[in-house]
């Protein structure tokens, strides 16, 4: 028997049935084409494996449409695909599915938690975006919603020349509520080297340049710059590319190999304006996020682990964010080759090849000169608080005046100036003893006539007439 065209179902007479079963398995391994029709008339063509599940199909559509998979519902012949494999619902090659968006109303739309928004943002990433980010080829930008505020996070990994070593660069901005409270530990997006356990090489510093007109990037190695956000306080995070290799070791690097606990440690933190922060961090990825060779796994779980390490590092960070003046001083005083016997903080303002005690004192004095007064930030916050208090006092005073005006308008016998003038004219033309007696008593018709100092013997006709 000759094989049929295509060879998909070829088997000889008398041959064991395994050959036909093998061809059948080959058929089942081929992808099947699905036509997805939306309620608005749009059509999408997808190729999925025969054993694809409903959850996998929704994830593919979520990545393609940039919509959370929880808000996608699929119908096949008026049957909703809830869970399980597509074959269980009779879906085959060339089947047509209807995409129905999920509409939420009432309080359910406000019940989404920040953790869900982070997972939705990460799940919407394609495999190419995840691979490019973890390899250091491109930054990762996430738009997250925290309550009524929008937060933009940009994270970038810069691969180093040393094996099993990479560097994270992150700049972040806090939410509006955190900026109003002055809480600098709520958003501690930072940038720093992240090295696996076996890394022993030194990490070069990172030099940053502005990459966004809204929020400048970090200025010096291990430092951040942030910019004030708008009234709605969107969070801007900028990343800086890796600089050329240098012999200066950043805080956290060690000349001898040693094991480090998984996690991140914030090295520096800079507050540029209310709601915008940046900084540097260093740490080691968790072994679950590394493959057998020690490289980060190409998975969104690795990105989520990095974000969790950053959030955990904020609780242990104890430091006052340096101001922009201090950063400019560090940039002007930074040496070309710092002395090896000084700490990283001292070498940032030391001159060229300073090894003697005199040069050490000069470097320390330059650091003190670069540091601005520590109460400058507090003075700015105090001025803002005073302005708010004065505005509240003004609003309260205006409210008291309006309340008094309404109370006077409801009082008895309120005389307007025009009515007083008309009464004086009528009194002068009427004659008799009434006007003269009223004038002699000195009544003021603008004030209330029921004051205690008024003579009680006055008859009613002089007051009311």
From Swiss-Prot:
Chain spans, region Required for nucleolar localization: 397-424
GO molecular function: kinase binding
Expression by tissue: Expressed at high levels in brain and liver with significantly lower levels in muscle.
Ranges for region Disordered: 185-262, 400-445
Localization, UniProt: Nucleus; Cytoplasm, Cytosol; Nucleus, Nucleolus
Superkingdom assignment: Eukaryota
Chief location bin: nucleus
Keywords: Cytoplasm, Nucleus
Ion transport keyword on record: no
Xref: InterPro entries: Midnolin, Ubiquitin-like_dom, Ubiquitin-like_domsf
Presence of keyword Nucleus: yes
Biological processes annotated in GO: negative regulation of insulin secretion
Signal peptide annotation: none
GO cellular component: cytosol; nucleolus; nucleus
Biased amino acid composition, Low complexity: 195-219, 240-257
Transmembrane segments: none
Residue ranges annotated for the Ubiquitin-like domain, each copy included: 32-106
Assembly behavior: Interacts with GCK; the interaction occurs preferentially at low glucose levels. Interacts with the proteasome.
Functional description taken from the UniProt entry: Facilitates the ubiquitin-independent proteasomal degradation of stimulus-induced transcription factors such as FOSB, EGR1, NR4A1, and IRF4 to the proteasome for degradation. Promotes also the degradation of other substrates such as CBX4. Plays a role in inhibiting the activity of glucokinase GCK and both glucose-induced and basal insulin secretion.
Protein's name in the database: Midnolin
Source organism phylogeny: Eukaryota, Metazoa, Chordata, Craniata, Vertebrata
